[in-house]
Amino acid sequence: MNAMVARLLEQPFVYRWWMAPFAEQKLRPLRENGGTSGVRRVLDVGCGPGTNASEFAHTDYLGIDINPLYIENARGRHPGKFMVADVTTFEAEPDDRFDCILVNSLLHHIPTPEVRRLLGHLETLLTEDGAIHIIELVLPPRPSAPRLLAKLDRGDYPRPRAEWELIFSSHFEPVVCNPHPVGAFGISLWEMIYFKGRRRANAARIRASQ
């Protein structure tokens, strides 16, 4: 992505304007798979300027992001707690546990070793009945508009769908893992993947109780 455009997107107003037409689409699988109903404590990793916060106004919500301008903007617009933090080195309080962890369009900005470290830490923060919800940018294998836009994205690490699935399932027991196209006027502009997972130690117990 052009460096000037990337710098513009670091401004909260510009980022919110750019995301507005697609925010509802991106979060649709989260709603459809119980990510916003009945949850108590939410950790939104890479929360931006509060892009997802309104979905969790009824919860004990913590959003973290490395951009202080995003966090300042989010604090002025939403309830809940927002914290400036580098997600690749973020460490929660020892007793912090969340029944919903959301990672929305963050991991394609991060090299694989840091992604694995982050997901390993997030697994320890889930409650026994909690779930992680991940929405990520896919790099399609063939030339297409979604492949071009993935290449032009600010993130340097869009990955093929199979690679995302392998990364996610190596840390969490899959509950849902589906392709999720996002676009406009019936045209797919980005290929995304939606993943819902649980802590491996608790997945079998939860299935047995349902």
State what each model feature region is.
Residues 1-92, 110-117, 121, 131-210:
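Class I (Rossmann-like) S-adenosyl-L-methionine-dependent methyltransferase catalytic domain
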Residues 102:
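A conserved beta-strand element that flanks and buttresses the S-adenosyl-L-methionine
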Residues 106:
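Hydrophobic adenine-recognition pocket in adenosine-nucleotide-binding enzymes
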